[in-house]
Amino acid sequence: MPPLKILVCDDERHIVRLIQVNLERQGWQVVTAYDGKEGLEKVRAEKPDLCVLDVMMPYMDGFEVLKTLRREPETEAIPVIMLTAKAQDKDVFEGYHYGADMYLTKPFNPMELVSFVKRIAQGHDDGSGPKRYDLG
């Protein structure tokens, strides 16, 4: 079983590092980006199995990245967890409206994020048959 490849995109480098360390402890491969434009480019190039996106980022916010991912056939099925300080009901609704699979607000518990990733990975099916990941 291949390890899960996860894109983490947030403009706060210490948050990216915190997430990266916790995901890599699970044996997963982590690709990082620090703004929305770079995140979108890395999704297209790296083809991750899952994305963790902040909302408030330079150049392109996380909602714009999410909307773009959902419009493109190559990326429309990639699961997305929004991880953001935007915690009002309207923000959460907007995230789900644009196609987020889960919405986690900051401050967050890194192990809760790990749990979300496991839950999504276990239920993800891209139509090519059963997909299994080594979840550690």
Predicted feature descriptions by range:
Residues 108-118:
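C-terminal output helix
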Residues 27-34, 42:
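Short hydrophobic/Thr-rich beta-strand motif most characteristic of the beta2 strand and flanking loop
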Residues 57:
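Receiver (REC) domain active-site loop signature in two-component systems and cognate sites
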Residues 17-25:
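Charged docking surfaces used in two-component/phosphorelay signaling
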Residues 46-52:
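Active-site beta3 strand of CheY-like receiver
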